Amino acid sequence: MKLTFIGATHEVTGSCYFLEAAGKRFLVDCGMEQGPDQYENQDVPVPMSDVDFALLTHAHIDHSGNFPLAYARGFRGPIYATAATCDLCDIMLRDSAHIQTFEAEWRNRKARRNGQPEFVPAYTMEDALNVIQQFVPCDYHKIIQLADGIKVRFVDAGHLLGSSSIEIWITEDGVEKKIIFSGDIGNTDQPLIKDPEYLESADYVVMESTYGDRSHGERPDYVQELVDILRRTFKRHGNVVVPSFAVGRTQEMLYFLRKIKADNMLPEFPDFDVYVDSPLAVQATNIFKEHYVDCYDEEAMELLNQGINPIAFPGLKLSITSDESRAINFDEHYKVILSASGMCDAGRIKHHLKHNLWRENSTIVFVGYQAVGTLGRALLEGAKDVRLFGEEIHVSAEIVRLSGISGHADNEGLMRWASAFKEKPQRVFVTHGEDTVCTLFAERLKNELGYDTYAPFSGTVFDLVNNVLEKETEGIIIEHAKEKAKARKASGVYARLVAAGHRLLAVIRHNEGGANKDLARFADQINSLCDKWDR
């Protein structure tokens, strides 16, 4: 009964885990890395043809995007996921294959001109279409017997339509262990979808830590923030360009924009158009309509019961063909453009950035996570010039981020999820976070909840029966990332300091109601320590 960590270890993208148990070999997630890699990922330690089946937490490409590659390498087993996840993967894996093929063709035109070897995409459309046939839809909350000694259950993670945490019960040689994969834990009070569910028992937990080092803060009024952005941009006769994940975030933005129009919150600009320039987003929106019973929250259901489509409104224009996409940039009227990809590394958004980044009157609004090394992250961090389609583009547009809007729980949301267990798990593995964040959040779980935590690197193997590391690995830094290694090491030490600060706050809370004399002495000791280091 072994667990091997493959991807999203000390990194955010590329989730993949390999389990050997009860005579079966299976994967949990098989994600594609997005943005430059920091560490090398080890391969699955057996031929893909020997993998019996897979489980998938949700449809985002950083969790599902390498299933076509697994197929190309021989994987033929079933992939179990919620019904909504299966439907979303149907369109998202096709889209991923299309983007890869398109990018390969573009790169190869340049390669041929320069006499360089051709670039081969990781997988083809045929691989994607074939692996889609292997998906098996599962209901939320239903325990499913996948094999002798292996049962699973999907519960709502509140991150994306169909997203799940997965409970796995494994029995081997009379020993039963329960392991939970958190998947991506959702933020609370998101539009359309339900909040994440909490789980109460597990022997082992594999937990994400995307925002394990930060708080979203007090929830802003996103609708009013959007109104303010639209008003000042439209007054400049500029466009509002929103790089948005086609699945999930685009539908949330449509939900907000519908409210702005329905409540006449921009009376001076009542006729503004909203373009959704993404065939994938259009398809995803239709899937959102199909799975509302299982996934929608009460507020969205109330609108539907009143006959109101929560993500449709006058002035909404869906762009599917390339000609329709190109025509958007010839429309001189102020407008909102929602386009993918959300991190600006692929898709039609790159064309809209090329046409709007140089314009002082336009605004680029980021509404989602931007991984290290992506174009979106560079723009958020103040890049003055960027390169698009071989052309240097000066950044003159206003760059804005809707603070706190996220499909991911922040550090407090993660702590709430982790603290729901009635008994301490034997071990909590912290993954799916940037390098220092994994370390920081593992320390916080240890200090505040008393959990035995570990932040593994790719290739680490854990014996689930005996609760011991069978193989411990160190992160292998990819060559281009070595220059950042010293900075990461320094920030890792700082992460320990921050974790110690969190522990101190927890100790202070634990002493509430203590004797005044003891509390006064404790306060004096803290102040003395602060005086020493406040320099």
Spans of features found by a protein language model:
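Short secondary-structure boundary/capping segments
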Residues: 94-99, 103-106, 221-223, 256-261, ...
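Short, surface-exposed amphipathic charged segments that create phosphate/polyanion-binding patches used
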Residues: 150-154, 287-295, 415-416, 465-477
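Charged, amphipathic alpha-helical linkers/stalks
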Residues: 459-518
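Hard-cation-handling environments
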Residues: 229-374, 386-387, 422, 437, ...
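Generic long, charged, amphipathic alpha-helical segments
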Residues: 387-418
